[in-house]
């Protein structure tokens, strides 16, 4: 018996519709057992129905990262949720045949004081108040000073997060199977401060410095922590990875062109 659990966006009609259809389909298959939220830790697969935000929220619930994620897109963009709503049955048929296409996504472990978080996309520091002019921060790489950043903030992203906030701030696109740090300044005051890519084997420490007094640290767009001057945000790669089930014919570069219109003439 293959045990799985389902997380879906309860605020979206399309996601609710797919959830009901999927539940009916799975119950018709004797090989699958659908678990409730209380028993999610026993699941071999977790099905996420919604958009990228639903997957990121679901990621926080997943304690055992050995579980495999089946991400079904119920919306429009769905860069992380690559399985189309009309193609999910083939995924489950392939599971029964033992044919699974899995891609590992590496994520951060983030330590802020005594609190610990996981970040699949990014960690970023911004102003705590829109009225404040700038936020000043320093970054250290394995205890070596990298530089001081002045502006609206700074983003530290994974390759998975390279197509999210970091991209909007002018960062590069990086293929998601890599283990790297992308550091992207947000509206820097110094024109020489540009995005930089670092090895994933290092530890990054981000600190707030004067004249800033307070800042906000955001983890995957959902967790907000107010930090004071000289507080440390420690970021390193987890030894675990997230396993995402992909369609057989999935081609990353096709996804890049289809979802982000990369390289296309938009005029």
From Swiss-Prot:
Kindly list the GO CC terms recorded for this protein: cytoplasm
Reaction equation(s) it catalyzes: NAD(+) + ATP = ADP + NADP(+) + H(+)
Keyword check for Electron transport, yes or no. Answer: no
EC number(s) in its UniProt entry? 2.7.1.23
Q: Which residues bind NAD(+)?
A: 52-53, 57, 121-122, 132, 150, 152, 163-168, 187
According to its UniProt entry, what is the function of this protein? Involved in the regulation of the intracellular balance of NAD and NADP, and is a key enzyme in the biosynthesis of NADP. Catalyzes specifically the phosphorylation on 2'-hydroxyl of the adenosine moiety of NAD to yield NADP.
UniProt keyword Nucleotide-binding, yes or no:
yes
Q: Where in the cell is it found?
A: Cytoplasm
Q: Which InterPro entries match?
A: ATP-NAD_kinase_N, ATP-NAD_kinase_PpnK-typ_C, NAD/diacylglycerol_kinase_sf, NADK
Could you state one GO biological process linked to this protein? Answer: NADP biosynthetic process
The protein's matches in Gene3D superfamilies, at most eight in alphabetical order, are given as: Probable inorganic polyphosphate/atp-NAD kinase, domain 1, Probable inorganic polyphosphate/atp-NAD kinase, domain 2
Q: Per its record, how is this protein called by name?
A: NAD kinase
UniProt cross-references to PANTHER family, sorted A to Z: NAD KINASE (PTHR20275:SF0)
- Provide the active-site residues from the annotation: 52
What's a Pfam family this protein contains? NAD_kinase_C
Question: What's the family?
Answer: Belongs to the NAD kinase family.
Question: What are the UniProt keywords, alphabetically?
Answer: ATP-binding, Cytoplasm, Kinase, NAD, NADP, Nucleotide-binding, Transferase
Q: Which cofactor does it need?
A: a divalent metal cation
- Domain of life, per UniProt, equals Bacteria
In alphabetical order, the GO MF annotations are: ATP binding; metal ion binding; NAD binding; NAD+ kinase activity
């Amino acid at each position: 018996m293959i045990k799985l659990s389902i997380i879906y966006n309860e605020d979206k009609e399309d996601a609710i519709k797919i959830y009901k259809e999927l539940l009916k389909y799975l119950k018709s298959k004797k090989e699958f057992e659908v678990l409730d939220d209380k028993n999610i830790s026993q699941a071999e697969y977790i099905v996420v129905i919604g958009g990228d935000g639903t997957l990121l929220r679901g990621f926080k619930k997943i304690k055992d990262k050995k579980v495999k994620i089946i991400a079904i897109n119920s919306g429009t963009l769905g860069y992380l949720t690559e399985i189309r709503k009309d193609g999910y049955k083939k995924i489950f048929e392939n599971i029964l045949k033992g044919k699974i296409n899995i891609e590992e996504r590496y994520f951060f472990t983030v330590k802020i004081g005594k609190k610990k978080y996981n970040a699949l996309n990014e960690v970023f520091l911004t102003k705590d108040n829109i009225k404040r002019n700038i936020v000043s921060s320093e970054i250290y790489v394995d205890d070596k000073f990298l530089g001081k950043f002045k502006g609206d903030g700074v983003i530290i992203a994974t390759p998975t997060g390279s197509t999210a906030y970091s991209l909007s701030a002018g960062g590069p696109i990086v293929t998601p199977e890599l283990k790297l740090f992308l550091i992207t300044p947000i509206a820097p005051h110094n024109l020489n401060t540009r995005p930089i890519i670092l090895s994933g084997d290092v530890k990054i420490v981000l600190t707030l410095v004067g004249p800033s007094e307070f800042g906000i640290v955001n983890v995957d767009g959902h967790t907000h922590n107010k930090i004071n001057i000289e507080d440390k945000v420690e970021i390193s790669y987890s030894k675990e990875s997230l396993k995402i089930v992909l369609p057989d014919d999935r081609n990353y570069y096709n996804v890049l062109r289809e979802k982000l219109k990369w390289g296309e003439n938009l005029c």
